[in-house]
Regions:
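Active-site-adjacent helical/loop segments in soluble small-molecule enzymes
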Residues: 28
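Active-site glycine-rich loops that stabilize anionic/oxyanionic intermediates
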Residues: 64, 83, 88-94
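Short, hydrophobic/aromatic alpha-helical segments in well-folded domains
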Residues: 88, 100-101
Length: 132
């Protein structure tokens, strides 16, 4: 995306240069149907890492095709309900990062879930049953 050579008004409507696949809508209809038919089986386990101002958990849920997904979930101890949250995704060959890298968000009143994307360097499984 050309961040510096296009005015903001054009950036707001910019759609890239790759054509939209012909099966785009059908693909997403199938994917959403599969996701909605998946029982997430959410587990929230207290983490070994703890700090005085945050509750820290290992969060697990089942994604499509049965893969177990892991996230580091932290929330402020005195959080109002509802309150803002951040969902953090890492780049390829990475993982969700260290617990301490998420504390800044919690200190500002945000919950944060740092996901281990499937098939990468963390605890999540891919649909082939591989961890990491």
């Amino acid at each position: 995306m050309p961040l510096i050579d296009m005015p903001l008004s054009k950036l707001k409507t910019y759609k890239g240069i790759s054509p939209r696949p012909k099966d785009f809508d059908a693909f997403w209809a199938r994917a959403l149907k599969e996701m909605r038919g998946t029982d997430p089986r959410v587990e929230l386990k207290p983490a070994a890492f703890q700090v005085p101002f945050a509750d820290c958990f290992d969060l697990y849920f089942t994604g499509v095709r049965g893969a177990r997904i892991h996230a580091k979930y932290l929330r402020p101890k005195k959080a109002a309900a509802p309150h803002p949250a951040v969902v953090q995704f890492h780049g390829y060959s990475g993982n969700c990062g260290d617990w301490s890298s998420k504390l800044e968000y919690v200190a500002r009143g945000y919950s944060i879930a740092g996901l281990d994307c499937r098939g990468q360097g963390g605890e999540s499984e891919d649909s082939g049953g591989v961890k990491g």
